[in-house]
Amino acid sequence: MEAPPVTVMPVTGGTINMMEYLLQGSVLDQSLESLLHRLRGLCDNMEPESFADHELVYLLKGQQGNPFILRARRSLLDPSVPWHLRYLGQPEVGDKSRHALVRNCVDVAASHSLPDFLNEMGFRMDHEFVAKGQVFRKGVMKVVVSKLSRVLVPGNTDNTEPLSLSYLVELSVLAPAGQDTVSEDMRSFAEQLKPLVHLEKIDPKRLM
């Protein structure tokens, strides 16, 4: 089967149950430095956070319908920090007035035995990848620029291969339900990143 669409959010702490507002795009490797320079000028006056994470995507197939998907992620830079378990709900794409994709997001810290727990619960690891990049912040908005690599040997994060010749760029906000005005702020910020990157409201179902 084709892998579910990737969404990259580094292990930097999580909120229990919020709505995620999301815009996505990509930038070619040769244009990366120009984008990073633009982000340094537009975002808060602080150094971006570097991250290198290993994510495992688990599926639990039910009697009918789509499988239940959970994402387990750990930091490769600091193995002592907790794992993170993430659930992303179905996107609410029907409202054309929203400038961003909106979906429920549940994010909790977990112990290092998380993979064993998921296996015991009947989940099957579908695929894994490594994400390396930087996180910029602009108020409540977060911009993640990351290079995604496939893991060639299961569990061996030292043996990877880039998925593409580009970087994934994600602009997101975590907020309580009903805070749709943040999508207008996101749209305005995304306009300032053109033409280096075009951030869009992407329906994951179109990519399946």
From Swiss-Prot:
This protein's UniProt keywords: Activator, Nucleus, Transcription, Transcription regulation
Chief subcellular location: nucleus
GO CC entries: core mediator complex; mediator complex
Single Gene Ontology MF annotation: transcription coregulator activity
Statement: the UniProt record of this protein carries the keyword Nucleus: yes
Pfam families the UniProt entry points to: Med18
Family annotation (InterPro entries): Mediator_Med18 (IPR019095)
Compartment(s): Nucleus
Superkingdom of source: Eukaryota
GO biological process: positive regulation of transcription initiation by RNA polymerase II
Subunit structure: Component of the Mediator complex.
Task of the protein: Component of the Mediator complex, a coactivator involved in the regulated transcription of nearly all RNA polymerase II-dependent genes. Mediator functions as a bridge to convey information from gene-specific regulatory proteins to the basal RNA polymerase II transcription machinery. Mediator is recruited to promoters by direct interactions with regulatory proteins and serves as a scaffold for the assembly of a functional preinitiation complex with RNA polymerase II and the general transcription factors.
Record family assignment: Belongs to the Mediator complex subunit 18 family.
Record's protein name: Mediator of RNA polymerase II transcription subunit 18
Species this protein is from: Danio rerio
Lineage start: Eukaryota, Metazoa, Chordata, Craniata, Vertebrata
